[in-house]
Regions:
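SAM cofactor-binding core of SAM-dependent methyltransferases
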Residues: 2-53, 71, 78
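Class I S-adenosyl-L-methionine
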Residues: 6, 37, 42-44, 48-67, ...
Length: 165
């Protein structure tokens, strides 16, 4: 199965799919930190998500007719509820709001471009935010405390994730 893991420079998910025998590739705007440049595409996901000629980080070129599965982790900086307060004049100057609003719109476009890719199986992960009202409700809500070590494990205890698929 041809698997594209979008917005993933760490290659953690990509490596697991490879371990299971799939032809998986990670894709991000930056070089990978996972140590497998032959499995990494440094490009905008929108340029390769519908298949075609791809160039891997190690400069190898190959053709992918179509992806069988796309899993995406688009940046949440402007999409999450944590970003919402930055769009309020009570806490942020107008010139910064304008810039953040443009960044939010671009982030929403990226999310929607991935959601509308020519692929039968698409999964998008993001925290609670604007997309569950601007797009639709998620198919699954993942509560991080299911995986937390303890209540003191703040990062893994409180940041609810949404899965669209």
């Amino acid at each position: 199965m041809n698997v594209l893991i979008a917005c993933e420079e760490s290659q953690r998910v990509c490596k697991e799919f490879r371990r299971k025998g799939h032809q998986a590739f990670s894709c991000d705007m930056v070089k990978c930190s996972g140590g497998k440049p032959e499995w990494h595409i440094v490009d905008d996901i929108r340029c390769i998500m519908n298949g075609g000629l791809i160039r891997l980080q190690n400069q190898t070129k190959m053709v992918v007719d179509k992806w069988d599965l796309i899993i995406a982790h688009p940046p949440c900086t402007y999409l999450s509820n944590a970003a919402t307060s930055r769009h309020s004049l009570t806490s942020t100057p107008l010139n910064k709001i304008n810039g953040r609003t443009l960044s939010r719109i671009e982030s929403m476009r990226l999310f929607m471009d991935i959601a509308m890719a020519n692929c039968n199986k698409i999964a998008i992960e993001n925290p609670v935010g604007i997309m569950n009202t601007a797009y639709r409700k998620p198919d699954q809500i993942i509560e991080p405390y299911y995986f937390a070590e303890s209540e003191d494990d703040f990062e893994n205890y409180t940041k609810k994730k949404l899965a669209y698929g």
